[in-house]
């Protein structure tokens, strides 16, 4: 089972020590790595609880207290930086949560539920089609026994006005993802493609 690397854990501890993570939850591949050890993932992507404010200026001032910070992007709703070479992103995110994020007491952070991560991955695939996003969604759908009808219900509950047909088309467009290489995903990639081809076919036939 894979787990956070030592340098990831140490960088996260520094960020958590600032007290800025309490209004955020971790999502993305690293959230799944912590929960399941399913693949290696390098970045920490934090999102605001829907009802919490995002004070970009205040948060960035706290982060600047750390040494070896390199800013990549700052705006009123997004902060992205490197700490000791580890990438952190903090986003204002107003979409509703389908599940309450769970508190990981060992790390001192909240981690998004699988339903929310799956929806976010589905939208990410429609936007850019990364191999990591395909793999993570494949992992979650298999783990929970979800078909695309179930995924559609979840996605439409989280993103009210979304056109799910765009996601369906994206789930069988693999050209960009095939260009990417990740050692721990490659052994499963053929299975991932076949899984989504099958699920899309079943969805369109029903």
From Swiss-Prot:
Keywords annotated in UniProt: Plasmid
InterPro entries, sorted: AbiEii
Record Gene3D superfamilies: JHP933, nucleotidyltransferase-like core domain
Protein name, as recorded: Uncharacterized protein aq_aa25
